[in-house]
């Protein structure tokens, strides 16, 4: 049901390293963000540890083994799945505007594999 370790998202921008936890609505992964830091004399490629939350409404969906796409069991389930996916996307966008030392920073929200993902700051020990 989880994405495999090493799986890439957003055309290689993010890579899953391992599962941190999962519940009824989401699977949370630790991952890396491939980015670059630019200075006045050059650019350095770097990997930033991040947290990636995948919307996976486990009672209503499953993952295709070959494509890793998230599929819904029924049309009734599709209505519920889509409704909560849109709420998750909206919540991520709102959270991205909140900046506080005790609230995790959101990098972006995106759709891929038939579901939604939130890329956010990784805080060790949480």
Task: Report residues per predicted region.
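Flexible N-lobe loop architecture of eukaryotic-like protein kinase catalytic domains
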Residues: 21, 90, 99-102, 124
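Conserved short submotifs of the Hanks-type protein kinase catalytic core
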Residues: 113-126
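Protein kinase glycine-rich loop
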Residues: 17-23, 28
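Short acidic/glycine-enriched loop/turn segments that link adjacent beta-strands
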Residues: 23-25, 112-115
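Glycine-rich ATP phosphate-binding loop
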Residues: 30, 38-75
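Activation-segment/catalytic-loop signature of the eukaryotic protein kinase fold
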Residues: 109
């Amino acid at each position: 049901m989880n994405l495999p370790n090493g799986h890439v998202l957003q055309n290689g921008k993010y890579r899953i390293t391992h599962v941190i936890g999962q519940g009824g609505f989401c699977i949370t992964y630790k991952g890396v963000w491939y980015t670059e830091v630019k200075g006045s004399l050059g650019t350095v490629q770097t990997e930033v540890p991040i947290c990636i939350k995948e919307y996976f409404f486990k009672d209503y969906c499953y993952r295709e083994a070959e494509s890793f796409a998230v599929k819904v069991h029924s049309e009734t389930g599709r209505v519920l799945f889509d409704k909560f996916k849109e709420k998750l996307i909206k919540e991520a966008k709102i959270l991205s505007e909140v900046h506080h030392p005790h609230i995790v920073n959101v990098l972006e929200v995106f759709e891929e594999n038939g579901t939604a993902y939130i890329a956010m700051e990784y805080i060790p020990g949480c």
